[in-house]
């Protein structure tokens, strides 16, 4: 396996590999761009529900949800990526993931599909593949006429770890 493929495998939490050369991903849309995350990091996908705002929480935290008795912070990927924030629609979803031992949700415009792709079609992200920070991108998959941006959840939410802990503490108080 090439150094790039090793990096991608390590970047995708728990590696959603189906076979030696397959990745299994959940794909979704945010601000017209298609993204994907490793299916093994995804705990569930929910329709939008009412979020409870937490006083004095930072702007990247939209609020918290009570999911079967567990308080889960929810972030809006539009806000996180610096896109124009918009109201949720009937297609909006909350994707609940586990990242670095923390469970959190993030809002996406819509979920597309679960997809298996050959690891060989994934390349390192060019610097200007998207308007988001390339540090958050594990790679880019080329599927026919579309680009699939694979997110590195660990890096994407690492800066929010302390914020999330404070939000959870405030919500529990």
Q: Where on the chain are the PLM-derived regions?
A:
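An acidic, low-aromatic, low-complexity terminal/linker signal
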Residues: 1-173
């Amino acid at each position: 396996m090439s150094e790039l493929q090793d990096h991608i495998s390590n970047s995708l939490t728990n590696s959603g590999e189906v076979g030696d050369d397959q990745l299994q991903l959940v794909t979704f849309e945010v601000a017209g761009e298609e993204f994907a995350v490793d299916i093994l990091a995804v705990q569930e996908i929910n329709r939008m529900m009412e979020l409870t705002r937490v006083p004095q929480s930072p702007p990247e935290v939209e609020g918290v949800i009570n999911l079967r008795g567990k308080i889960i912070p929810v972030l809006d990927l539009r806000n996180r990526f610096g896109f124009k924030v918009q109201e949720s629609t009937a297609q909006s979803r909350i994707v609940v993931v586990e990242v670095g031992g923390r469970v959190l949700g993030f809002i996406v415009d819509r979920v597309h599909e679960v997809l298996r792709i050959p690891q060989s079609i994934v390349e390192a992200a060019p610097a200007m593949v998207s308007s988001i920070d390339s540090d958050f991108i594990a790679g880019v998959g080329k599927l026919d006429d579309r680009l699939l941006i694979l997110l590195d959840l660990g890096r994407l939410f690492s800066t929010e770890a302390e914020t999330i802990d404070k939000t959870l503490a405030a919500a529990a108080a």
